[in-house]
Amino acid sequence: MTTVHGSTIDIPTQDGVADAYLTHPDDGVPHPAVLFYMDAFGLRPHLTKMADRVAAAGYTVLVPNVMYRHGRAPVVELPEFINPAERPEIFQNLRPAMQSLTPEAAMRDAGSYLAWLSASPLTTDGPVGTTGYCMGAGLALRTAGTYPDRVAAIAGFHGAYLASEAPDSPHLLADRITAEVYFGHADQDSAMPPEQIDRLEDALTAAGVVHRTEVYDGAHHGFTQADTAAYDAGAADRHWKALLDLLGRAL
């Protein structure tokens, strides 16, 4: 297995400084870049392990703490394993940070993350890939639509409210996307019901975006997150194959 090197770094943004986890093969040569968007629980050991796995496949991976305006990660105290009974209190504590991350603020930040990756000697020239989980899937989709000249691949897993009726819903950026797209939805996910899955699919198809959308039978919201009760090993394995296949094709 490829040895990777991970570290915590700081990235200047228009609104401050974002802490982030950076990981890459420990071989001294540049690699294609991947912008990895966290779920709502944020930067924590499980996510850094996931990022390391992507890096081991031959990528330089950046995982920003997108809630940096409310403090360095972890923004709120998290248990080693997040039990269902603890989720309401955790989300209550996270709500101010989540609500302050408006689409406009998130995309200003995305420009800073992409600029940092472009300037880094650890990355190759050319476009990046982006992947996101839970709310991060929406951030990945917005990034691909806001910076189409910089993003060649976008993946999202158990994404939330990607095609709502809100006037700033992420799916409304579909006609700006030039990247190849993959979404893996959970069929037991109230945050991404069938009507939103269909609306997202219709938007991508109408825009002529090269894409693939799959619904993972029996999976719940958060199925990739091994430190939660929603984890589904089979669905997580399926996600890894889909993600790494996409990055391998597009980058």
Give the ranges of each region predicted by the language model.
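N-terminal cap/leader regions of alpha/beta-hydrolase-fold enzymes
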Residues: 1-251
